[in-house]
A protein has these predicted regions:
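Pore-lining and gate-forming transmembrane alpha-helices of multi-pass membrane transport proteins
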Residues: 36, 150-181
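Alpha-helical transmembrane segments
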Residues: 37, 41-45, 128-131, 135, ...
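Hydrophobic alpha-helical transmembrane segments of multipass membrane transporters and ion channels
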Residues: 30-37, 110-127, 161-169
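Hydrophobic alpha-helical transmembrane segments
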Residues: 23-62
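Predominantly long cytosolic amphipathic alpha-helical stalk/bundle segments
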Residues: 54-146, 175-208
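Extended, hydrophilic extramembrane loops/domains of integral membrane proteins
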Residues: 1-16, 88
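Residue-level signature of catalytic and energy-coupling elements of molecular machines
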Residues: 29, 43, 79, 126, ...
Length: 208
């Protein structure tokens, strides 16, 4: 559009009247604020879990290089079960090792379910805000009429803000869930691998 043309003045006025990001955010209303709060919580939760799992992973890697099982890391606690039960049969040891791995699972997977729920609920909250905003817009049209297309378009635009916010929360949360889950599963794989190896060694020794 040519700013110097016949419609240039209207175009420039539209640019000037374009809401800022903060104003757009406020247009989302209470639902928008709730979505933002949920998103901030998901981000903080994911960061905390990544830090915790990184520390656990470092401790597990250190345990792999150590000949002495220590109770300050998940793998060490699993290995201690074998050391504390040197004379039990292979089947019982396998059950005890599986139980030890299961005891560590909740600590490793903590927060994953919550992140998944937030990723699913955020778009629905956005849709709720949009539907509510559309209802308010059409109620206003019913009362005041549709004589001003700009007002109608502005109301619809404001209603759609919550959908955008919901997606802006859901998409990063899905990615964060994938990262956190990947780190947790990596540690779980090491625990299962080491537990299976110990049971296999015990079974081989018993066979000899």
């Amino acid at each position: 559009i040519d700013p110097t043309g016949p419609t240039g003045g209207s175009f420039l006025a539209a640019i000037i009247d374009t809401p800022t990001l903060e104003e757009r955010w406020h247009q989302g209303g209470y639902v928008g604020y709730a979505i933002t709060t949920v998103g901030a919580f998901a981000f903080l939760l994911a960061i905390v879990r990544v830090i915790m799992l990184t520390m656990m992973g470092a401790a597990v890697n250190s345990q792999l290089k150590s000949g002495e099982a220590k109770a300050n890391n998940p793998l060490g606690r699993v290995l201690l079960v074998s050391q504390e039960n040197p004379n039990i049969d292979t089947e019982t040891l396998e059950l005890k090792m599986a139980e030890a791995v299961l005891r560590e699972t909740p600590k490793l997977e903590s927060g994953l379910t919550l992140l998944k729920i937030i990723a699913a609920v955020a778009p629905l909250m956005g849709l709720l805000g949009t539907v509510t905003g559309m209802i308010i817009t059409f109620q206003a049209i019913t009362i005041f009429g549709a004589g001003d297309p700009k007002a109608m378009a502005g109301g619809i635009s404001s209603a759609l803000i919550t959908t955008v916010l919901g997606l802006l929360v859901a998409i990063p949360t899905v990615l964060l869930h994938t990262v956190v889950n990947g780190r947790a599963q990596k540690i779980m794989h090491i625990l299962n691998e080491q537990a299976t190896g110990i049971v296999a060694e015990r079974a081989e020794a018993a066979g000899n």
